[in-house]
C-alpha cells in the first residue's frame, strides 16, 4: 500500500488559499484525484468537495558536487466542504 499524502505544503502563498477552504499537499506522483480525496477524508476526518492536481517539473540544480537533478513531484489542491477545517494548518 502506497502512502498517498507525503507532506502538507505550508507556504505564504498557500496560507491565502486556507481562508477559502483550500489546502495544499505534496502527494505521490502516481496517485489519482480519487485516491487523494479518500486519503484526506480518512486521515483528517473531513468532507472533501474537490481535488485539483498539478505535476511540478524537475530541474537541474547546481551544488558544490556538480549538477544534480531534482525529481518531478505532484501537489494537490484540496477544497473542503463548507465549514470544514484541518487543524494542522490552523495557527500557521
Swiss-Prot record:
Pfam families xref list: Ribosomal_L23
Key words of the record: Ribonucleoprotein, Ribosomal protein, RNA-binding, rRNA-binding
GO molecular function terms attached to this record: rRNA binding; structural constituent of ribosome
Protein name stated in the entry: Large ribosomal subunit protein uL23
Quaternary data: Part of the 50S ribosomal subunit. Contacts protein L29, and trigger factor when it is bound to the ribosome.
One GO-annotated biological process of the protein: translation
An annotated GO cellular component: ribosome
Organism: Bdellovibrio bacteriovorus (strain ATCC 15356 / DSM 50701 / NCIMB 9529 / HD100)
Function comment: One of the early assembly proteins it binds 23S rRNA. One of the proteins that surrounds the polypeptide exit tunnel on the outside of the ribosome. Forms the main docking site for trigger factor binding to the ribosome.
Similarity remark: Belongs to the universal ribosomal protein uL23 family.
Amino acid at each position: 500500500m502506497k502512502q498517498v499524502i507525503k507532506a502538507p505544503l505550508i507556504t505564504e502563498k498557500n496560507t491565502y488559499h486556507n481562508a477559502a477552504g483550500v489546502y495544499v499537499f505534496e502527494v505521490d506522483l502516481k496517485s489519482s484525484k480519487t485516491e487523494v480525496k479518500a486519503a484526506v477524508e480518512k486521515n483528517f476526518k473531513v468532507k472533501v468537495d474537490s481535488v485539483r492536481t498539478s505535476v511540478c517539473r524537475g530541474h537541474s540544480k547546481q551544488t558544490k558536487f556538480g549538477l544534480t537533478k531534482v525529481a518531478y513531484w505532484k501537489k494537490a489542491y484540496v477544497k473542503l466542504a463548507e465549514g470544514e477545517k484541518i487543524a494542522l494548518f490552523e495557527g500557521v
